[in-house]
Every structure is written in C-alpha cells, then in structure tokens.
Amino acid sequence: MAVDMRILESLDQNAKLTVKELAIMLGESEESVAASIREMEEDHIICGYPTLINWDKTDRQLVTAMIEVKVTPQRGQGFDKIAERIYQFDEVDAVFLMSGGFDLCVMVHGKTLQSVAEFVSSKLSPMDSVLSTSTHFVLKKYKEHGLPLVQKIEDERMLITP
C-alpha cells in the first residue's frame, strides 16, 4: 500500500506523469505501477485525471457560482439521495455535505449569470427536499486545486524617497 500512496501523491501533483516516469521515480517496475494504477481506477480510488484550466485567459466566457442549499434529509437515506439527484445535472461541478448554517454546497458553472439563475430557479429550488438556496457568484479565482491562477505583476514604478 505504501507504493500506492506514493503513486497517488505523485499523480496528485502531476497527473501527466507516465507509468514509465512513475516507475523510475518510485524504483518499481512499470508492470507493477500499471497494475496498481489499474486496480486503483477499478476501486474508484483514482476517479479521473482532470486538467486545471484558467478559463479567464481564454475567449470562453464561464460563470462559476457556489450555492448554499438547505434541505430536508430523507428518512433512511439522509442527505445522500438529494445530493445524488443534484450532482447529476450537467451544470453541477461539485456537491459537498457541510457543517454549519446550510447542508449542501453546490458548485455550478454556466455561460452567463442568467443561465446559473435559471438553473437555480427551474431545476434546483423546485426539487423535493430543497428548503432554500443562496447563490454566490465567483468574481475572481486566485487559486484552485492547490495551484495559483494569477501571476504576480511586478510594480515597475520608481520609488520616491524624501
């Protein structure tokens, strides 16, 4: 399992690593690394290999929102059933069970503010068990998935001294 953890930690830092590169880094055979990865994929320990894209640097317009959702848990299923219904919408990027003032945090994306508002009003709010929602639009992303998205701008002004 120690090798599996080292594979996971390496892939978490750089999902582009090849089996060959991982094998060299870990001092293992390519076959054993490939088998470990395959097994972890089958067990849903490795669930995918997403790429982090800074959409603000492209021509594509994308609006991101965090929606606080208060729900009534269902008998015998708690929050799981409603969370499953919510995460199946294409607009939904992530759903988290939260502690505190609301139950679920739903991260969504859309082409416009209006498309996100339409999602909330026509799909999310009318669902059985949903008591209320509060939508917060992301204005700027500074860091995501542990990686900074903004570049430091060096101040090129000359210092003024008395």
Regions flagged by a language model, labelled:
Residues 1-162:
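A compositional/biophysical signature of low hydrophobicity enriched in polar/charged and small residues
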